[in-house]
């Protein structure tokens, strides 16, 4: 049922005042009376918009430094009153019906994110009256409209103009859902913040008592896309994103052209983009089934692409390609003339490249923007009945942190190759082995239960493409528990090995490297990826 409700009286109280003056002016022009509080009321008055202070309406002043403003029966009775049922009692107590509530909440997340934020600062930014009004209006959505997002202001005015200054029940219900989502997210942020203080109980936000993991884990994501299916065709799926993601990512990327991204497209594109971010030089990463099958650097992205493709042209078919520089016309031409590709993602795409890619209508082209700093988000893995939550693996050793444990020191070229393939190995499914030489992958062995077999696969892949393993560096995402992996690497022609170290048999493994005249480098950091 349409069940329209006319808008005659509004209550406006916002912390984020984006667009509020224009919205209030539009409401006034449509005959709506406005109640408001504090800073919002002052702003509207300064703009010559007729407004009644809530304290004047209730006859009760704001008090306790603004802690108590709207918590009054004349406010909540006007919001919660059921039209046609509570009219008599509202009239008896001088309560005017409020038809639309426009509220957004104190900036708690922004406050606690600031350096030096104290518990007292956080507490004063916990909104009480705001969520109460939001929930009251959302509960009474049958009669009252609640607006918590500035991007809905134009929508409200447009519907009023086409619906005799009224809003439909469908619109009110939709806005009520957004309101409950808003307060749920807000309360979750507060719970997370306080939960990280256990067992210090807020006495000090520093030191050993602080935990980055709260007692309960509250996170909210917004649905960005319904999908045809999930990882497999019998699985239903949707894509959810954080409310305000800051980092350039597949979640924030703009799709320039192509079919809708599939579940697997998104997972693989994320893997490719996060890998290519590790490199400062022009780089290309080609991913298949969430594993890099070719990674290379070059003087430009065209050269990087040619070299990355050379590693494994077979696996590159139907893959995902990521760049850390603008996709130009020459590279777009090379890709479209050479191979079938599902997705290309880059920080930016030239107009000429867009025109070239347009000939491949199904090819998904994404532009993610530049990235600068890495975020401190969590990695979340669902298990049956629970969640595994950890820091994102953003660790990467520098040259100064490496420990050469072999008798032979690596040459400058070997050291450079070792650092390159170590970065790649971080993004290969465990057990991961990567061969590289001259800033390109020569062979990749991924996802084997045996580290030795991963090494063998890397060698087989290199041989299949006619690439020379002799003189390569080899990276292993975790330590070698036995010397057999080193013996196999030496037989293949590997001259330098980079690995975390830390095995009970490190001495045996190092001795094997020395026997073969290999250089061996310990990173002291493991990069398992499951």
Swiss-Prot record:
Listed GO biological process terms: 'de novo' IMP biosynthetic process
Domain of life according to the entry: Bacteria
A GO term, aspect molecular function: IMP cyclohydrolase activity
SUPFAM superfamilies membership: Cytidine deaminase-like, Methylglyoxal synthase-like
InterPro entries in the cross-refs: AICAR_Tfase_dup_dom_sf, Cytidine_deaminase-like, MGS-like_dom, MGS-like_dom_sf, PurH-like
Domain MGS-like: 1-148
A family per Pfam: AICARFT_IMPCHas
Keyword presence, DNA-binding: no
EC number: 2.1.2.3, 3.5.4.10
Catalytic reaction list: (6R)-10-formyltetrahydrofolate + 5-amino-1-(5-phospho-beta-D-ribosyl)imidazole-4-carboxamide = 5-formamido-1-(5-phospho-D-ribosyl)imidazole-4-carboxamide + (6S)-5,6,7,8-tetrahydrofolate; IMP + H2O = 5-formamido-1-(5-phospho-D-ribosyl)imidazole-4-carboxamide
Gene3D superfamilies for the chain: 3.40.140.20, Methylglyoxal synthase-like domain
One cellular component (GO) term of this entry: cytosol
Spans through the membrane: none
Keywords, ordered alphabetically: Hydrolase, Multifunctional enzyme, Purine biosynthesis, Transferase
Pathway: Purine metabolism; IMP biosynthesis via de novo pathway; 5-formamido-1-(5-phospho-D-ribosyl)imidazole-4-carboxamide from 5-amino-1-(5-phospho-D-ribosyl)imidazole-4-carboxamide (10-formyl THF route): step 1/1; Purine metabolism; IMP biosynthesis via de novo pathway; IMP from 5-formamido-1-(5-phospho-D-ribosyl)imidazole-4-carboxamide: step 1/1
Domains: entry comment: The IMP cyclohydrolase activity resides in the N-terminal region.
UniProt similarity note: Belongs to the PurH family.
Protein name: Bifunctional purine biosynthesis protein PurH
Species for this entry: Aliivibrio salmonicida (strain LFI1238)
Protein encoded by which gene: purH
């Amino acid at each position: 049922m349409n069940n329209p409700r006319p808008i005659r009286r509004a209550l406006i109280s916002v912390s984020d005042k984006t667009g509020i003056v224009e919205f209030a002016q539009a409401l006034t022009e449509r005959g709506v009376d406005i109640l408001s509080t504090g800073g919002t009321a002052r702003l509207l008055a300064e703009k010559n918009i007729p407004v009644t202070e809530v304290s004047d309406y209730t006859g009760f002043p704001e008090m306790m430094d603004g802690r108590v403003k709207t918590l009054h029966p004349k406010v909540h009775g006007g919001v919660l009153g059921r039209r046609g049922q509570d009219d008599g009692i509202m009239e008896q107590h001088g309560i005017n019906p409020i038809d639309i509530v426009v509220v957004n909440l104190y900036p708690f997340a922004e406050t606690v994110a600031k350096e030096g934020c104290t518990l007292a600062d956080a507490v004063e930014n916990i909104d009480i009256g705001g969520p109460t009004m939001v929930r009251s209006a959302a509960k009474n959505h049958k009669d009252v409209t609640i607006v918590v997002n500035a991007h809905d202001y134009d929508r409200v005015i447009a519907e009023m103009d086409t619906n005799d200054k009224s809003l439909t029940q469908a619109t009110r219900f939709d806005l009520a859902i957004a309101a409950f989502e808003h307060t749920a997210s807000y309360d979750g942020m507060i719970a997370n913040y306080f939960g990280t203080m256990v067992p210090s109980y807020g006495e000090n936000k520093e030191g050993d008592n602080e935990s980055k993991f709260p007692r309960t884990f509250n996170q909210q994501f917004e649905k960005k896309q319904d999908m045809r299916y999930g990882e497999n065709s019998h699985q239903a799926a949707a894509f959810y994103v954080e409310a305000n993601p800051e980092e350039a990512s597949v979640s924030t990327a703009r799709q320039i052209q192509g079919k809708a991204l599939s579940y697997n497209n998104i997972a693989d594109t994320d893997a490719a983009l996060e890998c290519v971010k590790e490199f400062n030089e022009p780089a290309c990463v080609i991913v298949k089934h969430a594993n890099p099958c070719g990674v290379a650097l070059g003087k430009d992205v065209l050269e990087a692409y040619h070299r990355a493709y050379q590693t494994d042209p077979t696996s590159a078919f139907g893959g995902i390609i990521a760049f850390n520089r603008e996709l130009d016309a020459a590279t777009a031409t090379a890709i479209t003339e050479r191979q079938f590709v599902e997705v290309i993602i880059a920080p930016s795409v030239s107009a000429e490249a867009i025109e070239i890619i347009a000939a491949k209508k199904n090819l998904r082209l994404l532009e993610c923007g530049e990235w600068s700093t890495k975020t401190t988000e969590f990695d979340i893995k669902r298990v049956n009945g629970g969640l595994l939550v950890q820091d994102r693996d953003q660790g990467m050793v520098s040259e100064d942190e490496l420990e050469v444990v072999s008798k032979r020191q690596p040459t400058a070229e070997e050291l450079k190759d070792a650092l390159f393939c170590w970065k790649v190995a971080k993004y290969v499914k465990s057990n991961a082995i990567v061969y590289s030489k001259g800033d390109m992958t020569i062979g990749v062995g991924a996802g084997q239960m045996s580290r030795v077999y991963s090494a063998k696969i890397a060698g087989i892949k290199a041989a299949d493409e006619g690439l020379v393993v002799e003189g390569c560096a080899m990276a292993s995402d975790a330590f070698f528990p036995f010397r057999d992996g080193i013996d196999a690497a030496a037989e293949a022609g590997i001259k330098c090995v980079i690995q975390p170290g830390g095995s009970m048999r490190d001495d045996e493994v190092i001795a094997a490297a020395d026997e073969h005249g290999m250089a061996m480098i310990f990173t002291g950091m493991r990069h398992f990826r499951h």
